[in-house]
Amino acid sequence: MDHFLYRDGALYAEDVPVAEIAATVGTPFYLYSTATLLRHFHLFDDALKGMDHLVCYAMKAASNQAILKTLAQAGAGMDVVSQGEYLRAKAAGVPGDRIVFSGVGKTQDEIRTALSGGIRQFNVESEPEMDVINAVALELGVVAPITVRVNPDVDAKTHAKIATGKSENKFGIPIARAREVYARAASLPGLKVIGIDVHIGSQLTELAPFELAYQKVAELTEQLRADGHDIHRLDLGGGLGIPYTRSNDTPPLPVEYGAMVQRTLGHLGCEIEIEPGRLIAGNAGIMVSKVIYVKSGEDRDFLIIDGAMNDLIRPAMYEAYHDIVPVIEPSAGVEQRAYDIVGPVCETGDTFARHRDMPPLEAGDLVAFRSAGAYGAVMASEYNSRPLIPEVLVNGDQFAVIRRRPDFDEMINRDTIPEWL
């Protein structure tokens, strides 16, 4: 469920007409709903009631500080994967003891920043990383809390580019080697082993891969405890998907996921961390764009819009589907037309949809890309020297620009021309 609904013939974001925001901000832009963000966070938080837990929002999905602050005030921790994300979370008021640091390529500077500013734990991905964290911790005179990310070799049944739990993926250590790696971690004086980390992929639409991975984690927990390790925290990653299409194939609900976690891991008495990103932010955001031209081709019609692949890369990168709807509600029974919906970037890959049925549209009409709140603005670029588009947050009957559109001078003047030119 989200809070982008038609009312009186027009699309609203909570209690604000989307067209009103477009008239103020200009198109294209991202638009987020506070009510939807909070609803999705609380669905996850409530699903784990009865277990000691922390929901750490995976801020790589959408990292604007206004979104982070909204979720942190509701009780969320943060999962970060870079120094920039760590500093962004801190700037949004998130305390270090509610931030977990993931990622396969943590640098010494990133580790030093997190240890100096406070960190809940590092999710360690390799033995060389373990050595670096130990060295930096000893240099600073602190002890670094760590979990080790294990790779359970489970097929997440998702897009190959976002699968992370199979043996050929770059993430974690093979679960078969976990006991020797934990023994080595325990011997390093700058580290404190506190738990296990696992994350098998993104946009999962079944519970079975999660359950198989978590069963392996449960077995490993008991083995490591028998070896003398104090395993009291399990970071289960994220990955639960969202419905991008209107089909009946909806992913499991958070409450169903929570029940599975309880029956699979509840007997261990561990603190549980989960790292949802897409499920919290995905349906909480839309991208609004304007039709520039309607062009008739040899065998098809094109809707050329002012949003482009540099603004929303998912369709070009992942062949991802987004429901695209007119901001003015079409009349009941209106005849549909098939369009290829494309942007102005000079690549054929700048295509959002092919043969998509839409009501007849004209230049100047607004369209909204649903389920664009996750991996939208954060993956945008300035390709073709197109400025990053604004982000707007709605809260009830009010809205605010939370990232403005830079002007062309700002973008161009970042360049430095050498003296010899």
Task: Locate each region found by the language model.
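Active-site loop/helix belt of alpha/beta enzymes
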Residues: 152-294, 358, 384-386, 395
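Short acidic, glycine/serine/threonine-rich loops at helix termini
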Residues: 67-68, 91, 111-116, 133-136, ...
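Active-site-proximal loop/turn and secondary-structure-junction residues that shape catalytic pockets
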Residues: 61-63, 84-85, 105-106, 126-128, ...
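A charged N-terminal "starter" segment
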Residues: 1-145, 183, 187-192, 219-222, ...
